[in-house]
């Protein structure tokens, strides 16, 4: 599960960079939402992954 969270976090960061860079100006809001969503998923899966060993 942690690997999925890291994968989606990287995708969200790439989308944010492209959105903030002016390449896809309309996608900026989506990139912000995805970044926050996958950052939260990353943190949650990181802590639950540590508990399971």
Swiss-Prot record:
Q: Where in the cell is it found?
A: Cell membrane
Main location (coarse class):
membrane
Q: Which InterPro entries does the annotation name?
A: DUF1328
- Mention any Pfam family matching this sequence: DUF1328
Task: Give the family, as the similarity comment puts it.
Answer: Belongs to the UPF0391 family.
- List the record's Gene Ontology CC terms alphabetically: plasma membrane
Q: What is this protein called?
A: UPF0391 membrane protein PA5482
> Which chain regions cross the lipid bilayer?
4-24, 29-49
Q: Which NCBIfam families match?
A: PRK13682.1-1 (NF010226), PRK13682.1-3 (NF010228), PRK13682.1-4 (NF010229)
Arranged from A to Z, the UniProt key words for this protein are: Cell membrane, Membrane, Transmembrane, Transmembrane helix
> What does the record say about its membrane topology?
Multi-pass membrane protein
């Amino acid at each position: 599960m942690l690997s999925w969270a890291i994968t989606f976090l990287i995708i969200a960061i790439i989308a944010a960079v492209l959105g903030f860079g002016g390449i896809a100006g309309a996608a900026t809001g989506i990139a912000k939402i995805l970044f926050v969503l996958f950052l939260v998923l990353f943190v949650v899966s990181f802590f639950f992954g540590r508990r399971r060993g």
